[in-house]
Amino acid sequence: VIERCYGEGAQAHHQLASALQLEGWDEIKVIENTGVPVIKVTSGGGLISVDISFDGPAHRGLNTATFVSYLVTVHDGLHPLALVLKQLLVERGLNDPYSGGLSSFGLVLLIAFVLHQRRQRNGDVAENLGEALEEFLRFFGDEFDAERQGISIQKWQVFPLPTSLPADDDGGISAPARDPLTIEDPTNPSNNVGRSCFGVGALQRVFSEALRAVVTAQGSEGGSVLGRMFGQGSHHMKVVELVKRTWCPPEYAPLEPPPAAAA
């Protein structure tokens, strides 16, 4: 989030996008027809994606970041679970709210919801990440009904959605119709974090399939149980290789031995 800029509105976004064109990014795209315009840039052969936005009256990204930091301090398992599940959504093309996926904030809220429920039952014992992952996948993949239920983070509960929508003058459903996924925003009660998640059906199928893969893998020999969530030659392995080449060059190009000392 950029807090200050010298341009106005779309002008500032296009100015920055033009400047970034000179910095070696693989792809740069300005998305303007949203509540908060954003610049999306990718690098590393499309493996690394960054969103850039400008602070303004409608922008709540800084408040969101503060709240997420708070959740991470409260729930030890939130960070690793978010990394794994975010990568799963990246692989399935469901991580981008601008194309009907679930935002990172929305995913974090869902994970925090499950972790809170587990703490209510188990007390302050050390979190079992494997069990927490299974519970998340089972609840949001098989049990949660997005058409009839919403998630409240303020009250930490599932709540029923209205069974009927207001009618227009002709007796039909008035626009806009109900959002595809309801996740209350604890930083802004009037905002639904899941309002743009039109791929919620596919999202829940991904969680359900991941659960089956993890459960089945527990009774098999060899391989990573967690890795069964991801396909062969998958995106996450390409990310691992990119990180190794970027941050662990000695693994790919061993250091030359030091020259022998002169006699």
How does the language model describe each region?
Residues 4-12, 30, 55, 68-69, ...:
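N-terminal regions immediately upstream of nucleotidyltransferase
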Residues 4-7, 44-47, 57-59, 78, ...:
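Conserved beta-strand elements of beta-rich interaction domains across eukaryotes
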Residues 13-59:
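Conserved catalytic core of two-metal-ion nucleotidyltransferases
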Residues 24-27, 35-38, 93-99, 123-124:
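Eukaryotic intrinsically disordered and solvent-exposed regulatory patches
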Residues 63-106:
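Basic, alpha-helical interaction scaffolds
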